[in-house]
Amino acid sequence: MREQRRCLLASTCLSSAFLRPLRAAALKTPMTQTITLLLGVHAHQPVGNFPEVIEDAHQRCYKPFLHTLHAYPDFRFAAHFSGWLLDWLRERHPADMALLAEMVRRGQVELFSSGDTEPVLAAIPHRDRIGQLQTLNDKLTAWTGVQPSGAWLTERVWESAVVPALAATGIRYVTVDDYHFFCTGQPATALDGYFSTEEDGTRLDLFPISEALRYRLPFSPAHEVIAYLEGLAEQGQVAAIYFDDIEKFGIWPETYDWVYHRGWLKALIEGVLASPKIRTATYADFHAGNATRGIVYLPTTSYSEMNEWTLPMP
């Protein structure tokens, strides 16, 4: 019996001695840091624009973008189409828009709402804000079966007075620029999640769009964008937030050849999906799985370029 105890004790000590360095090695092995890419695109044409202009935009931008993304169901993103443009495209290109509806239903795409005819919400009365938002909400819900939770703000013009109308129509969050947050003293390193604001006790959440990403997509080579995102992940950033004009992906000068013929968009998608440090998500999924970073009160403003363009000429 005494010998059995000695053997058991020796075995336990050996096991502990053997496992100790393995445990130490495991503790020294860093966990892979991941970042969530929240990618969103915004599509709009002025109400009453020439049909040939919209058709050109569809052939060089909307159509190839949707067809490319449709081939990668694991790449999740958000999209906003203004109401009247959506009507125009669904009437003239039903097959292409059916791809978008399919991606929404399979959870790949989140459609954002807004005012139906793309008004600056801060510039119209509360009752008209309600009507504009509800019109597009109903249109999107009837078309896809999914009620929108997010909204695009035209020209990213922010004024706290828009909060009640957005909340009253079921909108839980909007995207604004990181510039809005810089005006409150927030550092760029803190803008990797969403914040909350309120107006008369009514809550709305705010996602800060990264200017650094706006200037990189789609102009920097895809591998440089991937490296930039992975670098953010290594710094401990939780999310990289992008929401900008889809027309940059085909309509802007030289972008059609660059994005599609030369394969920039496919390279970006495949690089993101292949990276162990980057994941994609819809804004809705990220919002549901992460807590707010805190309360913020933004000044009345727009993105930095718009603030410059609206100044009086010397």
Tell what function each PLM region has.
Residues 184-232:
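Alpha-amylase-like alpha-glycosidases and glucanotransferases acting on alpha-linked glucans and related
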Residues 32-63, 70-72, 191-194, 202-203, ...:
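Active-site and substrate-binding clefts of carbohydrate-active enzymes
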Residues 5-9, 13:
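N-terminal export leaders
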Residues 134-190, 248-268:
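Catalytic domains of cell-wall/extracellular-matrix polysaccharide-remodeling enzymes
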Residues 34-125, 131-135, 149-153, 172-178, ...:
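Short, well-structured secondary-structure segments
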Residues 126-155, 199, 230-246:
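CE4/NodB-like, metal-dependent polysaccharide N-deacetylase domain
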